[in-house]
């Protein structure tokens, strides 16, 4: 027999969701009602945490991993899910995984945001992981608004929609034994749920519904970045294997606010940030791409030297890209760079500039994804 949890206080694990959230929910309910999922993605919202707050905008059914109904959650109340032995605990329920399914086209609450779709909570490591199970097209309403600027021309937002759809599908098809397809960060694609949905992103996603970039009949690895600094890169020059559709091309991103940038460091500050070399005496690129992007850097200090990768360099020095030059003067190192991101695939600011000049999204995509074709998704996508 099922039981419905009401607003009674269950220790500190039950709380009333913010009343203002109803304004957001009503607005998006009027804009578009969710449709039944055709391709469902698994988005990791929280991974291996000690507790995660979950809820629903409407009454919701709680099921175990086998689909058995365990009970119901009352609308607009949040519960904390946490580890219980080898299971997940949520109020009086306990199972290896729990699924929350809103009724009447409701939305799910995970930690501090509203999302479309359903919630799955699983036991992982010493904690629990919360996944948002969401339709691919509805996922894109949020991603396009988080990755691009909603006020951009529709053709730029359409290009972003196709790129993000293709990337998500590629990740889903290659996720293997992972329990999720994508997360919410720049490691995959930024995803903020209803918070980053806009009328313009809905329009762009719907106008390109089901369209992807493909090569040999398969979704491509449709990576993108903010600004290349004038020219994108061949993928093998920055990462590993060559791909026929990720080729370096002229970029049109000169309007980007991140097209040029600079940072200054003292020799002592660099030594502290890099560690193990003492006061820095020189920074010398040991490997660069044909367009000048640093892939490997030699740092020499008064106590030793170190060879670091482009990824480490960006993280340690918080650089927008590794396309830069270095000049030293009286113990100060000036780094003058261009662009923001890895410089491979679609340039978002380049797409903006082209769209602003009247170029259509299909031509934008053809420029940045050489040799790839704009096609329709196949009706069934195997996991």
Language-model features: where?
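Conserved, single-site charged/polar hotspot
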Residues: 2-383
């Amino acid at each position: 027999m099922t039981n419905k949890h009401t607003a009674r206080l269950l220790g500190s694990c039950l709380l009333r969701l913010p009343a203002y959230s109803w304004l957001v929910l009503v607005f998006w309910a009027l804009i578009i009602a969710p449709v039944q999922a055709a391709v469902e993605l698994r988005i990791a919202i929280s991974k291996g945490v000690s507790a995660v707050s979950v809820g629903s905008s409407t009454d919701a059914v709680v099921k175990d991993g086998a689909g058995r109904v365990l009970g119901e959650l009352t609308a607009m109340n949040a519960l904390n899910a946490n580890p219980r032995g080898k299971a997940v605990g949520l109020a009086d329920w306990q199972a290896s995984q729990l699924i929350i399914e809103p009724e009447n086209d409701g939305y799910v609450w995970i930690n501090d945001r509203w999302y479309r779709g359903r919630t799955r909570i699983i036991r992982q490591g010493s904690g629990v992981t919360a996944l948002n199970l969401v339709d691919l097209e509805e996922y894109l309403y949020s991603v396009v608004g988080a990755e691009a600027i909603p006020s951009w021309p529709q053709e730029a937002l359409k290009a972003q929609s196709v790129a993000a759809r293709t990337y998500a599908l590629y990740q889903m098809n290659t996720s293997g034994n992972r329990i999720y397809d994508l997360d919410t960060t720049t490691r995959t694609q930024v995803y903020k749920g209803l918070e980053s949905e806009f009328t313009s992103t809905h329009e762009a996603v719907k106008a390109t519904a089901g369209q992807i970039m493909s090569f040999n009949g398969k979704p491509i690895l449709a990576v993108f970045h903010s600004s290349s600094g004038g020219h994108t890169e061949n993928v093998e020059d920055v990462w590993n294997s060559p791909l026929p559709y990720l080729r370096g091309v002229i970029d049109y991103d000169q309007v980007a606010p991140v097209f040029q940038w600079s940072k200054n460091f003292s020799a002592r500050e660099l030594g502290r940030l890099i560690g193990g070399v003492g006061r820095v005496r020189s920074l010398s690129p040991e490997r660069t791409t044909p367009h000048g992007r640093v892939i490997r850097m030699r740092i020499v200090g008064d106590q030793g030297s170190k060879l670091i990768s482009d990824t480490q360099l960006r993280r340690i020095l918080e650089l927008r890209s590794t396309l830069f030059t270095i000049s030293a003067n009286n113990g100060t190192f000036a780094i003058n760079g261009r662009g923001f991101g890895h410089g491979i695939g679609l340039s978002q600011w380049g797409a903006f500039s082209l769209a602003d000049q009247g170029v259509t999204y299909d031509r934008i995509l053809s420029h940045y994804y050489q040799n790839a074709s704009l096609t329709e998704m196949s009706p069934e996508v195997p996991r």
